Amino acid sequence: MAGVGGGNDFQWCFSQVKGAIDEDVAEADIISTVEFNCSGDLLATGDKGGRVVIFQREQENKSRPHSRGEYNVYSTFQSHEPEFDYLKSLEIEEKINKIRWLPQQNAAHFLLSTNDKTIKLWKISERDKRVEGYNLKDDDGRLRDPFRITSLRVPILKPMDLMVEASPRRIFANAHTYHINSISVNSDHETYLSADDLRINLWHLEITDRSFNIVDIKPANMEELTEVITAAEFHPHHCNVFVYSSSKGTIRLCDMRDSALCDRHSKFFEEPEDPSSRSFFSEIISSISDVKFSNSGRYMMTRDYLSVKVWDLNMESRPVETYQVHEYLRSKLCSLYENDCIFDKFECCWNGSDSAIMTGSYNNFFRMFDRNTRRDITLEASRESSKPRAILKPRKVCTGGKRKKDEINVDSLDFNKKILHTAWHPTDNIIAVAATNNLYIFQDKVN
C-alpha cells in the first residue's frame, strides 16, 4: 500500500459527500462515529440523533472505473432513543458513541452500537423472497375462516423487491454507572468489552443479563480520584490482552490470564514529561482521546490533543514514533481552554498495512503521516473541492505574520469545524471523514 500522498506517491481525490449542505446544522444530524466493516464493503455512521446509516460499496464497473470508491445508502435505522433515569434525575441522550462490526459469519451482518448507557447488537439482513399460500391466512395476512378451507396448500416462496432489515438481537443494559466511551469486539468473536470513566466490563455476545467487571479504578473516596479511563481496546489477535488509556496520558496493557480482575496491569506505557515544557495545560493536553492497536498487533497508537504517538508493545518507556498534528496551536491553548475546544476528543486510525496513520484537526483539516518516509500531509474536507475525482490540494497553516498565497493563518482557523472521526478502508486506499453532518469519502487517484 502506498504512502499518504504528495511527491512521487499517489494523490488523494474526492469521491463522494453525504449529508445536507445547510448552514444551520441540526444537532441531531452531527455524525458521532464512523466505522468500516471487516471487508470494507459496508460503512456505518452513527449520529447524535441516535440513528445508524449504513452505506454499501458499489460493485466495480468496467465502464466506470472511478466508481470503485463509491458508497450508497444500504440501510438506515433508529438505534437509540432518548431516555430518562428517574433514579438519578438524568437525561440519557440518544447519541451513538461507538459502532463496532462483528466479523461476518453468514449472509447477515452484525454490529454493536452504544450510547452512554446501553449497548445493542443489530442484525442487518436482506430479504428478496416472501412466502405465499398459507392455509390459515390470506395473502394480505388476515386469518381465514377454518370452515371455508377445503384444500391443503403448500406455501411457496415468491420473489420480491430487495428489502434490507435491521433488527435488534440483544440489548445489553444496566451495567454502567458512568458514560460508555468504548466498545471493542474480541478476536474470539464471542466476547466484547465496554468501558466507561471508571470501569471496564466483559460481555458474552449471547448473554445480556450479566457481565464481568474486569477493571475498576473507582477509589473508595471519590475525592481521591485522579484519573479516568478514556478508551479501551482488545488486541486484534490475542483474546486475553486488552489496553486502556487514561486522562493522565498513560496506557495500561492487561492480560486476563493473570487474574479475573485486571486492576494490576501487565505493562504500563508512559512518556516521561519534559519539565521545561510544563504548563497549566500540560495534564489536559496529555489526556489520551483514542487508542488503537495496529492490524499486525505489534504496535498501538494513541492520540492526545496535539500529537499522535506510536508505541511498540515491547517498549514501555517511550513511544517509538511521535507525530505533531497541530503544534501551531500550542500558543493558543489559553483561548482553546476558554472555548472548551481543548477537551475535544480526536480519534485516529491505521491504514490496512499499518504504514500510514490518519487523524483529524480543526478547520475541517485532517492529517496523514507516512511511517516509512516520515512525510506528512494536511488535507481539507470541503465542498469547494467536491467535483468528482478532484485532486485534494495539500493545505498549510502559517503562524508568522507573512502568509504565502496557498497558506492559511492560524488565527483564521474555524474551531467549530472539526474532524473528530475518521476511518480507513481495511485493504484499499479509501477513507471516510466525518465533518459535522457531512460524510466525505476520498480515494487514491486512478491513473
From Swiss-Prot:
It comes from Xenopus tropicalis (Western clawed frog). Keywords: Cell cycle, Cell division, Cytoplasm, Mitosis, Repeat, WD repeat. Transmembrane segments: none annotated. PANTHER family: PROTEIN PHOSPHATASE PP2A REGULATORY SUBUNIT B. This is Serine/threonine-protein phosphatase 2A 55 kDa regulatory subunit B delta isoform. GO terms for molecular function: enzyme-substrate adaptor activity; protein phosphatase regulator activity. The keyword Cytoplasm applies. Belongs to the phosphatase 2A regulatory subunit B family. WD repeats lie at residues 26-65, 91-132, 175-213, 224-264, 283-321, 338-379, 414-447. InterPro entries: PP2A_PR55, PP2A_PR55_CS, WD40/YVTN_repeat-like_dom_sf, WD40_repeat_dom_sf, WD40_rpt.
